[in-house]
């Protein structure tokens, strides 16, 4: 399941593009998540009232939360798999407070891949996509493992 040094480099290279504009990337990821999987919107009291894509695009709170999500994920990716200290509190809050199922982490991972494909086609070829998929799968596996330890069946 681990990634090679070369794969981590591909992941971090494209992530550098994300970090150049985290708010717009995060906003687009969340909009894709909510439009593609409307049931996920129910987990966000702050955004439940946003029904249209235009309302979502106009929401500063949604943009801020998208930036928060991708900033946290970037911190995890930069650990190149040695992310236990970052995953534990994230899993704790997502299992006990927010009750976010692992399936929703799969959904948002798909959205992240789609946004990267859309915004950075030249920097996100097949090798980079494969590496990012592996990195996100590792993240989800470790979140699920922590969920299990916490007794959350999400």
UniProtKB/Swiss-Prot annotation:
Positions contributing to heme b binding: 94
Location relative to the cell: Cytoplasm, Sarcoplasm
Metal-binding among keywords: yes
Binding annotation for O2: 65
Enzyme Commission designation: 1.7.-.-, 1.11.1.-
Similarity comment: Belongs to the globin family.
This protein's name: Myoglobin
Organism: Hylobates agilis
């Amino acid at each position: 399941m681990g990634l090679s040094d070369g794969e981590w480099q591909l992941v971090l290279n494209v992530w550098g593009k994300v970090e150049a504009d985290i708010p717009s990337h995060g906003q687009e990821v969340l909009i894709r998540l909510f439009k593609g999987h409307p049931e996920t919107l129910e987990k966000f009291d702050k955004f439940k009232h946003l029904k249209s894509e235009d309302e979502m695009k106009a929401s500063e709170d949604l943009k801020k939360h998208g930036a928060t999500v991708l900033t946290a994920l970037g911190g995890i990716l930069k650990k190149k798999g040695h992310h236990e200290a970052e995953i534990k509190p994230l899993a704790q809050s997502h299992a006990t407070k927010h009750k976010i199922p692992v399936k929703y982490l799969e959904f948002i991972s798909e959205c992240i891949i789609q946004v990267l494909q859309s915004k950075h086609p030249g920097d996100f070829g097949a090798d980079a996509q494969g590496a990012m998929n592996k990195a996100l799968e590792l993240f989800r596996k470790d979140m699920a493992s922590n969920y299990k330890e916490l007794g959350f069946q999400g």
